[in-house]
Structures are given as structure tokens and as C-alpha cells.
Amino acid sequence: MWKALLIAAAYLASTMAIGRPVSYVGGWTVIGESDRQSSSALVHYTPSPNMSLGFRTEVNRDSDFAIYSVHPTLLAKRWFGADYQGNLYFHGGIGVASSIHKNPGSDQMAIYGGVMADWETRSLFVGYRNRYLEAGDYASQFMQAFRAGFAPYEGDSGDLHTWLMLEIDHRPSDPDSVTATPLVRFFKGPLLVEAGYNLTVNQPLFNFTYRF
């Protein structure tokens, strides 16, 4: 029985690790994200099983400023079962917020932090994340998002995996504070790609993750 549980846990870890903010020890990860408000790029290295550290660039298209930050992520807790995995992360960053696109603002300190949590089997997924950002005169904002989805088929290791998801996004400071985004996720090997469309504000969503 224990051998079967260990095999199942190892398989879940190998198939689900691609989307994780903490990779395997010694691994590098590149993450790109673009949603209704901002676009970002993160390159991080995983020095230990419970932490990654990287550099993140974020461009806020609505308010014409960018954030350049050091970005650590801590894996606080991981749960394994015979057919599921759950994770709890703390993430944050500190750096500089700078004006772009003729915004006359000056450089100011930016700091942010939040939590991420997810639970999934080979066919079901639920996730939550939030972040509070303080960037001087540029922004003081909170966001949170809940995501749920399912896999229309269960692939084996090395196959192309497909997920259909819905994300509910809440940003209290925005005029459209709550929005809905249906999306599709594909991953195979070290590459994960997500594409969707925000039905509330008519904006595309595109994310990718690549592990080295």
C-alpha cells in the first residue's frame, strides 16, 4: 500500500510541478503573465525544496508605471494524498517603481506580498492567490483571484495535458472590481501555456511557464 502511495505521489509531483512557483532544486524557471491590468516577466532559481528567488519586471498598463523587484517565494506547506496534492505559498517582492510612457513620476520604492494556495487531482483544480502592493504615488492596491477547473481527459506523463478553467478576479480599486475570465491551460514537458479572455472588460489573458 505504501509503495502504491509513494508511486502515486511521485507521479502527481512530476505532472503538476510545471505550474509551481517553486521548482526542483537547482532548476531555473521563466514565467510570463499578462492580464487585464499588467504584464510581467519573472526569472527565478530554486536553491532549496521550499524556496525560489528571482527577479521580476511588471508593467502596469493602466497607470503607466513599471516595477523592478527581487521576488522570493516560500513553500509553506505541501499536502500529498493518494490522488491529490495541495500547496500553500507566501510570495513577495521589494524594488523600484518607475514611470513609463511619458508619465512624469519619479522613482519610488515598491513592496508587495501575498499568498497562493492550490489543490488538485489529475482531473480537478482549485486555486486562490492574493497580493497587496504599495508603490508610493503610483499605486496602493489589493487583488485576489479564485480559479477552478477540470481536465477533459487524463493524460500520462509526457502527454499533452489540457485544462478548462474559470478565474474570478477581484480588484477593489478598479471600476470593474469583479471580473470573469474563462481560459484553457495546456502543458507538456517543461512548458505550460494559458490563454483566456476577460468577459467583463474585454481583455485577453496569456501566461506561460518554462522550466529548465
Question: What do the PLM-derived regions correspond to, one by one?
Answer:
Residues 18-181, 191, 198-199:
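Outer-membrane pore/translocation modules
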Residues 2-3, 98-100, 207-212:
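Short amphipathic alpha-helical segments
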